[in-house]
Amino acid sequence: MDPRQSRITELAIAIKKQTETLQSLLDSLKVATPSFSVNANQELPRNAAVQLAQSSILDSCTELQDLVEGPLAHVGRIMSPRVHISSALQAIVHFNIAEKIAKHETISFGEIAKRCKMDVDDVKRIMRLAISYRIFKESHIGFVNHTASSFLIAENLLVRQWISLCCDEFIPAGSFLVPAMKKWPSSEEPNETAFALLHKGDSLWEVLKKQPEKAQRFAHGMEYMRTLPPFDINHLFTSLNWEIDCEMVLVDVGGSQGSIAEALLRRHPRLRCYVQDLPETLSKAVVPKDLKGRLEFVSHSMFKEQPIKADVYLLRSILHDWLDGYALQIIRNLIPALEVGSKVIINEICLPEPNAISAYEAQLIRGYDLSMKQQFNSKERDVHEWETLFRLADRRFKLNRIVNPPGSFLAVLEFEWQPTTP
């Protein structure tokens, strides 16, 4: 870069080049340019080159916006209006606003209020904030249409459940983080959290056990997260690098309603899977017809001794819910079932070193880490913390490999049980 150029000029030039690269890739793949149209694609192709270009653009644009705003406006804008859009989205989902509008319909605020049984002024204020985020559009004064984002909310149950989970539970819990840290400094207990203060002492797990409808919503929310590109199941396939016809028995520990196991089974026709979770989580789990005889749901607490002998034990986004004392219990409960060469595969965020990834990605990953603190008193771990955790659990665990697939937030850490290890 020319040393005489300002940083904002450098970023503008970089964004132009990055955008041209992305457009060229989309043209070569015969994919339409991104747009806000209701008919637009919901995401860019899950192609490594496309995702790299996309990530570069987003990081450059974020930095440029932050610089141009200046620190006074930047800090202010983080708090408002970004905080308030969550309230608008909560109302949009609660009152089924997006679902009440047909895909190509133009509708007045008054008609929306009538269909959703709302005050018309409330509708107008909520909708116009959402519109500023390009969720709906006001085609002419007082009349709105769907955009790509609003129609996604209308047609995708998992998106609505994720919004509801965040707005009803996670975001309100955030306001109790400081009181929880002051009341229970250094606590590892799941009922001494910001979430527990919000829920009169109940941990998130206790709330889910008492309220099946919330357990179902939580399961849907986690399923939505798995649909996002950084959590794509194909990253797991790439990292495992198993032969298609591999013949193994796998236990998916805390596998919820089986979406990961189903994907693995359909990719590997000789694989057999047991999905373990609590009874309330499995209450609505169903084995698909094409997987009968190969997939089984088993009620089991990971805090009890593992009853199933298998070749592989998969823990995907499980241990980050627990600080070390509890995580060690979970790992040690696997040991009675392990045989020489048994694998324990951890599919979790492996926190990068500072400045190793873009600020745009770091905001997401560090946000997940703080969310773990708020909800569970737990955390995301870096590679040294993962190695230390398994060494403390039992020195007979050997770390075979760590894979960080490009474009994925989840690493694969493969530990092998070697009881002869000194």
From Swiss-Prot:
Pfam name, any one: Methyltransf_2
Induction: Expression is positively regulated by the KK-1 cluster-specific transcription factor kk1F.
UniProt xrefs under InterPro entries: COMT-like (IPR016461), O_MeTrfase_dom (IPR001077), Plant_O-MeTrfase_dimerisation (IPR012967), SAM-dependent_MTases_sf (IPR029063), WH-like_DNA-bd_sf (IPR036388), WH_DNA-bd_sf (IPR036390)
Gene3D superfamilies: Vaccinia Virus protein VP39, Winged helix-like DNA-binding domain superfamily/Winged helix DNA-binding domain
Signal peptide: none
Binding residues annotated for S-adenosyl-L-methionine, in chain numbering: D277
Record function comment: O-methyltransferase; part of the gene cluster that mediates the biosynthesis of KK-1, a novel cyclic depsipeptide with 10 residues which is a promising active compound with high activity against many plant pathogens, especially Botrytis cinerea. Within the pathway, kk1A is responsible for the O-methylation of tyrosine as a free amino acid before its activation as an aminoacyl-AMP by the corresponding A domain of kk1B.
Protein name: O-methyltransferase kk1A
EC numbers, comma separated: 2.1.1.-
The family this protein is said to belong to: Belongs to the class I-like SAM-binding methyltransferase superfamily. Cation-independent O-methyltransferase family.
GO biological process, one term: secondary metabolite biosynthetic process
Phenotype of the disrupted gene, per the record: Prevents the conversion of free tyrosine to O-methyltyrosine and, consequently, the synthesis of KK-1. Does not affect the incorporation pattern of unmethylated normal tyrosine by the A domain of the 10th module of kk1B.
Transferase found in the keyword field: yes
Pathway per the UniProt entry: Secondary metabolite biosynthesis
